[in-house]
Amino acid sequence: MSRLWVRLIKNHRIARQELVPCPWGEQHEALREACHTLDVPFPIWLDKHENEFETFRHTAFTDDHFVESIPFDRMEIEFLDDTGKKKRS
């Protein structure tokens, strides 16, 4: 089962985290579910984030990417693939 790992970083430490089941290509829905569970606003997803996520399976959102104020420094998301298939990094 593939998962999306959502981390809320404050002062260079993981303040909160959530693992959400996530098939490849459904990261927006999984991120929305994680944001709801963590009770944080949904970030603005830019082309920069899409490119980073597709290339590295990882991206980060800072306070510039949220409409509302946030109680953390940044949100990092990472796709964890447990299917055994290797992706080129």
Show the residue positions of the predicted features.
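Short, extreme N-terminal segment that most often corresponds to the first beta-strand
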Residues: 1-19
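Short, flexible N-terminal segments of the mature chain
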Residues: 14-41
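Non-catalytic surface loops within mature trypsin-like serine protease
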Residues: 10, 22-24, 81
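Acidic, low-complexity intrinsically disordered segments
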Residues: 31-89
